[in-house]
Amino acid sequence: MGYDPELKYSLPYTWGTVGILYNTTLVDEPIDEWSDLWDAKYTDEILMQDSVRDAFMVALKLLGYSSNSTNEAELQEAKEALIQQKPIVQAYVVDQVRDKMISGEAAIGVIYSGEALYTQYENPDLEYVVPKEGSNVWQDSWVIPKNAKHVENAEKFLDFLCRPDIAVMNFEYITYSIPNTTAIEMLDEEMQNSEVAFPNLENYELEVYQYLGEDMDTLYSNLWKQVKSH
């Protein structure tokens, strides 16, 4: 990751992608594009993420732009696309996407890959796809603050998390992808080859969200408010 390319200050914990989860019994053909979320035949069956960067990523990728765009004209265009989509969206959600998709309350939802993997355990009719227009790839990491009072204990905790057996237990509990290669080799072959849990990133057009500065944060937030209040 750009913030710590040599991993001198942080320890990778989990990672994943953002994509589309869909119920194969509720859609008439496979979903593989963000544009499918603008299809009126899925009115009131679509769940969008209630998150400014995730929502704008979807619209920006739909339009062929970077998810880290700082071009105001592109962002205005993305805002208009989200407003155009809004009448066919069932809800803007975060954690609720998981339960709604499992129960069949919605047919299509924008979701994080770790959540998607969990839903597939609960409902085998659910499929996850990273849209062909591109998406987001992310990584969560641990850091020890420079003013930490118990550095030794923090290091022991991180060493514990890095144990392959613990990493496997953690993965099986939270269902988010792990970067521990030794632990991955301890998983069954089907999971090791899962394109949901451990995709070959070279097969996808993916970007990491960048911090765009306070001015851009304000612009994104204001545009998102316009979408939500429309």
Language-model features and meaning:
Residues 102-103, 108-125:
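A ligand-binding cleft/hinge motif common to bilobed small-molecule-binding domains
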Residues 202-230:
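Conserved C-terminal helix/tail region of periplasmic/extracytoplasmic solute-binding proteins
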Residues 4-7, 118-130, 192-194:
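Ligand-binding "clamshell"
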Residues 34, 97-100, 116, 154, ...:
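Short, hydrophobic alpha-helical packing/hinge segments within bilobed ligand-binding/sensory domains
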Residues 17-26, 61-62, 138-150, 169:
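A bilobed periplasmic-binding-protein/Venus flytrap-type ligand-binding module shared by bacterial periplasmic
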Residues 1-105:
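Extracytoplasmic ligand-binding site segments that recognize negatively charged/polar headgroups
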Residues 145-204:
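Mature extracytoplasmic/periplasmic domains
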Residues 75-84, 122-146:
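Periplasmic-binding protein-like
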